[in-house]
């Protein structure tokens, strides 16, 4: 039997939100296999399904730098050990400089030069720091980018929209609407734009978890298979509506979906408006 360390239990608890003893028991039952233990907790209903990014365990900030013509944007996550350092003016200046450097040099990932800048400041401040991730989002001539930083920089979003009449992106009302989409994504962190973008193998696994939970539900004992399949289908449909951007209730009016809000905005301008991509960064998330 594999030895279960307190660090393993802590890591599983941070990932799933389940209790310490439940996590330890799951690791023991799975002989130390982290993925199996996580799945076991889900099947027992002790861990939330993956609707949101992992719980943040690091301090730091998300930085975004965008070109003046909104044709490209860079997102950066810079981490530190403490919130005190994450609020340090030198730390903030470094994050902004990294984002600007990456945008200027057309980078899409950290490199030795940027990591060296981080280590220089870490040595000066005497606290461990790290450039966790960096990416660039680009827009075509018929697309438009906007950004949103939440709070003190713990969440950052860049959203990309497309239109058959790209001149509408000069319209202030449309710009405001696209910004509200970025705000929505920051608030609800959808896993995908729509159902077609969901990985089917991953969805099959979630369906399997629902099946196990239903088998353990005393209220469903003795139900006909046809009835159970209907319940399962309903659970999957509800789950998809919670994790797919276009099916979520729009942040400014939850009576309508994001898809409907896009349609209504398009009608006002006489153009078709679609979301073609987005990037969501949360400090400490995997």
Give each language-model segment a name.
Residues 2-286:
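N-terminal assembly/interaction segments in proteins that build large macromolecular machines
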């Amino acid at each position: 039997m594999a030895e279960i360390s307190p660090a393993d239990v802590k890591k599983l608890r941070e990932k799933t939100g389940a209790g310490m003893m439940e996590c330890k028991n799951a690791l023991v039952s799975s002989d130390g296999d982290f993925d199996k233990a996580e799945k076991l907790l889900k099947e027992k209903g002790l861990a939330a399904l993956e609707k949101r990014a992992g719980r943040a365990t690091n301090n730091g900030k998300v930085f975004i730098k965008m070109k003046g013509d909104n044709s490209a944007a860079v997102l950066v996550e810079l981490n530190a050990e403490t919130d005190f350092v994450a609020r340090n003016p030198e730390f903030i200046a470094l994050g902004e400089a990294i984002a600007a450097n990456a945008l200027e040099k057309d980078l899409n990932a950290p490199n030795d030069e940027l990591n060296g800048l981080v280590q220089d400041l870490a040595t000066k401040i005497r606290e461990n720091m790290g450039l966790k991730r960096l990416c660039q989002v680009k827009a075509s001539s018929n697309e438009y980018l906007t950004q949103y930083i939440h709070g003190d920089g713990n969440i950052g979003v860049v959203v990309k929209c497309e239109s058959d009449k790209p001149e509408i992106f000069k319209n202030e009302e449309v710009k405001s609407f696209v910004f509200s989409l970025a705000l929505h994504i920051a608030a609800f962190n959808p896993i995908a734009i729509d159902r077609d973008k969901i990985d089917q193998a991953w969805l099959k696994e979630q369906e399997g978890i629902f099946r196990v939970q239903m088998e353990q539900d005393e209220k469903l004992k003795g139900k006909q298979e046809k009835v159970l399949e209907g319940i399962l289908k309903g659970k999957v449909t509800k789950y998809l509506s919670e994790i797919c951007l276009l099916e979520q209730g729009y942040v400014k009016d939850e009576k309508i979906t994001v898809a409907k809000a896009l349609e209504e905005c398009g009608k006002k301008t006489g153009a078709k408006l679609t979301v073609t991509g987005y990037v969501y960064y949360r400090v400490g998330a995997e």
